[in-house]
Amino acid sequence: IALAGLSILLFVYMGRNVEDPRAQLIFVATLMVPLVSISSYTGLVSGLTVGFLEMPAGHALAGMGAGPEGGVFTPWGRYLTWAFSTPMILIALGLLAGSNMSKLFTAVVADVGMCITGLAAALTTSSYLLRWVWYGISCAFFVVVLYILLAEWAKDAEVAGTADIFNTLKVLTVVLWLGYPIFWALGAEGLAVLDIAITSWAYSGM
C-alpha cells in the first residue's frame, strides 16, 4: 500500500506540467493503476476480497480443508483489481501507439472479458470441467489482447513515431501477462501443482 502511495505521488509530480491532451490521458491512465492497487490491497488486508472455497470433484484439492472454514483460500478480489488496472495499462499503451478508438475499445473490452471470465473460473465450484471451460474462454479473450498489442498497435506505433518506447513497454507487458494464465493453470485454482503462497507471490511480482 505504501509503495503504491509513493508511486501516486511520483506520478503526480512528474505529470504536473503535462499539457498535451493525449499525454494527459496517458498520464491519468497510468495514475489509475496504483490507485486501484491501493484499493485492492486494502480489500485483501481487511478480508473483504478473500474467501474459502470447496473445490469440485476431480480437483486436486477437492475435499481438502486448506483453511479454518474447510475450503481452499481464494483471494478472488485480485480479478476485480485486474479488471480495473489492466484496461488502464492498455489505454496508456494504445494512446502511446497512436491507435484509433476502435482498436482501443476492442482491446479494453477483451481485457475486461478476460478478467471477468477468469473470476468465473476461480469461483466455479459446481464442476471442475467448467472451471477449465471458463479458463479457456478467458484465454481466448487474452489472445485478442495479445494480437492487438503485438500486431495492430506495433504498426500504429511505427506510424506515430513512438515505436522504440512502445516496443519496450509492449514486450514487458506481454512477458509479465503471460505469467497469469500459466500460474493459474499450475496453481491451486487449476492443477494445484504449485502452492498457494507461491502463486500469490508470483501474481504480486507480475
Curated annotation (Swiss-Prot):
Gene Ontology BP annotations: phototransduction
Matching SMART domains: Bac_rhodopsin
Protein task: Light-driven chloride pump.
Locations listed in the record: Cell membrane
GO CC terms in record: plasma membrane
Domain of life: Archaea
GO MF annotation list: monoatomic ion channel activity; photoreceptor activity
UniProt name for this protein: Halorhodopsin
Pfam families: Bac_rhodopsin
Membrane topology value: Multi-pass membrane protein
Cytoplasmic topological segments: 16-21, 98-100, 151-162
Residue stretches spanning the membrane: 1-15, 22-45, 76-97, 101-124, 128-150, 163-186, 196-206
Chief place where the protein resides: membrane
Keyword Nucleotide-binding: no
